[in-house]
Each structure stands twice: as C-alpha cells, then as structure tokens.
Swiss-Prot record:
Every Ig-like C1-type domain range: 209-295
Signal peptide, first to last residue: 1-24
Species lineage: Eukaryota, Metazoa, Chordata, Craniata, Vertebrata
Source organism: Rattus norvegicus
Stretches of the chain found on the membrane's Cytoplasmic side: 337-371
Region annotated Alpha-3, chain positions: 207-298
Stretches of the chain found on the membrane's Extracellular side: 25-311
Transmembrane annotation, as ranges: 312-336
Entry's Gene Ontology cellular component terms: external side of plasma membrane; extracellular space; lumenal side of endoplasmic reticulum membrane; MHC class I protein complex; phagocytic vesicle membrane
Region: Alpha-2, residue numbers: 115-206
Membrane topology designation: Single-pass type I membrane protein
The protein, known as: RT1 class I histocompatibility antigen, AA alpha chain
Positions where Phosphoserine occurs in the chain: 362, 365
Length: 371
C-alpha cells in the first residue's frame, strides 16, 4: 500500500474531528500522532503534533536531525528545559510503541512486509468556560480507516473490525480505559488550563471577521454570490445565506474553515441566485468577536453594473452561437448519414475506455497498551 504524506494524515485526522468542534466559549487540548512504515528506507517515521484550540503549539518529528519535542507557538518558549526533556522522552516512547504496533497490525491483517502502512491517533479533552470537562476522546485509524475509538462514556471502546476487536480485548483486560479516563478528566484538563494561561494573549483573543460579498456570473445565466469572512480568530464561525430573512442552509455551498497562515482563519459560503435578484439575498455572519451578527449584501459599483450588462450580452450571444453551432452540426450529421445510406458504408466500431473502478503525562503512554 502506498503511504500517504504525514501532513495529509494529520489533516485527515483533523477533518475527522471537525463535526465535533468545541462549543463557543470552550477550549480543547488535542494531540495528533502519525506513524508511517517505509520498508527498505529505515525505521517508521513518527510525527506528534499538539493543538490548543486551533493553534499548533508543539511538534515532534523522528526524521529531524535532532528529534525533540519543539515549541510551535512563541508563548511555549516560556517552558523550561525539564518540560522539553520530559515531552521528548514521552514522544520517543510513543515512537517505539508505534513501531511495535505497525508490526502487530500487519500481522492482524495478514499483510506482507513489503508494503507501507500508517497508524493515526487523536486524543484530548474539551473543557467549558468554567474549566470543567465537556468531552474526552481517543480515536485510532489504520491505513486511513477507523480502527478503534473510546466511547463518550470514557469506559468502553468501539472496534471497527475483527483486528480492532483483538486490541479492544487486550485493552479491556489491561483496564486501559480507566487510566485513560483519569488522564482525560485530570491531567489533560490541568495542562489545558496551564497552556491557556501561558498563551492567553493569543489563545483568548477574539479577532472579528472582515466580511464582504462577491458576485460571479455563471454560463447558465444566473450568478453566484459568495460571502467571505477573513482574518478572524478563533475558528468557530457561522455563515448563513438568507432570502428575505429565511435561511437557505440547504442551498448553500460551504467550505471548511481554513487557516490563513497568520494565526487567523478564513471561510466562505456561496449561493446561486437569479440574475437581477441579488439584493434580495443577505449573508449573516456570527462570530464571538462581533458585538452582534453582521448582515452583508452584494454592493454593486458603477463599473460592476457596466460589467454585468456586458456579461448579459455575452451570455445571450453565447447562447445564440451555441444554437447556431448545434444546427450546423445537425445538418452535417444528416448529410453524412445520407451519404452512408447511398454508399452502403458503415461507421467504424469503437471500444469505450474501461472504467476505473502529551500532554505531559506518563499514564497515557503505557507500554502494556500496545495494539
């Protein structure tokens, strides 16, 4: 099996978590682990990344020249040498655990040694505005598919297939869920509080979005209105198109919130509307950095009006040209068919193309909880 890039795997894990984003006013501590085997190229690569809310704050990469847990946010540079030594030790323990797990799972699935395989893990906790635990989680995947997950009760596991059932049985005998629950309810919450205090100038800020609407003509004659929200933090935001005050959630195209690369985020939502009816549609923007929701409409400029008239003319001319082309092609086909009937000729056959079908916690990285 071809290995996916570690960054892609981390993004997949993040995407898998997207439907369960934290509530407004809450905060999260999450770790994403990825191990990729590479036969013939040395030991598996192991990457660990930690996030507080939507901000990456630590990273470990076994392929680095000097593999160590390193700060990824400036406020984490306040931690002393003991912290980084302990976090590096924990990351290296996980690296060894995953080397064993890759071999173990390859055996569970009866896979050859020649292929490359991946293990992914995400674990962490969400806390409310009062600092109490809202949710704890651990999810594991193998070769991009669900493998095993801790249930919401923090006591039981859901195994995706026969191999994961073996792991579940091992973890149940080791009472691993009890220790993991203790970490999620205690250590995870405590360290999240510490990180929020260290990075409060960054993590607890609220940057309101800058919003505007753009218009994009379509060949069909109608137009797309796209509502943009830029430069906001935190990432939680709601964009809703409305027609005369009624939500159009079923008719919208909505992209996932994306990092802008400067510590803020961006997002857009679009809707297709009849030409000339643009002013009936409004985009509602809700974000904790706004004192009240924004309502945005497309605001045409004089040059835009001229461009729209030109667009309408082009659309009409294009339609006329298309009709004319269809008529010409139809006439040519008719002539060819008459000639074939007169000459008794047959068209050539063709074959269609075939289808393509650590937090700082030692109680989580326990060696007796391998797969």
């Amino acid at each position: 099996m071809e290995a996916m890039a570690p960054r892609t795997l981390l993004l997949l894990l993040a995407a898998a978590l997207a439907p369960t984003q934290t509530r407004a006013g809450s905060h999260s501590l999450r770790y994403f682990y990825t191990a990729v085997s590479r036969p013939g190229l040395g030991e598996p690569r192991f990457i660990a990344v930690g996030y507080v809310d939507d901000t990456e704050f630590v990273r470990f990469d076994s392929d680095a020249e000097n593999p160590r847990m390193e700060p990824r946010a400036r406020w984490m540079e306040r931690e002393g040498p003991e912290y980084w030594e302990q976090q590096t030790r924990i990351a290296k323990e996980w690296e060894q655990i995953y080397r064993v797990d890759l071999r173990t799972l390859r055996g569970y699935y009866n896979q050859s040694e020649g292929g490359s395989h991946t293990i992914q893990e995400m674990y962490g906790c969400d806390v409310g505005s009062d600092g109490s635990l809202l949710r704890g989680y651990r999810q594991d995947a193998y070769d991009g598919r669900d493998y095993i997950a801790l249930n919401e009760d923090l006591k039981t596991w859901t195994a995706a297939d026969f191999a994961a059932q073996i792991t579940r049985n091992k973890w149940e005998r080791a009472r691993y869920a009890e220790r993991l629950r203790a970490y999620l309810e205690g250590t995870c919450v405590e360290w999240l509080s510490r990180y929020l205090e260290l990075g409060k100038e960054t993590l607890l800020r609220s940057d309101p979005p800058e919003a505007h609407v753009t218009l994009h003509p379509r060949p069909e004659g109608d137009v797309t209105l796209r509502c943009w929200a830029l430069g906001f933090y935190p990432a939680d935001i709601t964009l809703t198109w409305q027609l005369n005050g009624e939500d159009l959630t079923q008719d919208m195209e909505l992209v996932e919130t994306r990092p802008a690369g400067d510590g803020t985020f961006q997002k857009w939502a679009s809707v297709v509307v009849p030409l000339g009816k643009e002013q009936n549609y409004t985009c509602r923007v809700e974000h904790e950095g706004l004192p009240k929701p924004l309502s945005q409409r497309w605001e045409p400029s004089p040059s835009t009006d001229s461009n729209m008239e030109t667009t309408v003319i082009y659309v009409i001319l294009g339609a006329v040209a298309m009709i004319g082309a269809v008529a010409i092609i139809g006439a040519m086909v008719a002539v060819v068919r008459r000639r074939k009937r007169n000459t008794g000729g047959k068209g050539g056959d063709y074959a269609p193309a075939p289808g393509r079908d650590s937090s700082q916690s030692s109680d989580v990285s326990l060696p007796d909880c391998k797969a």
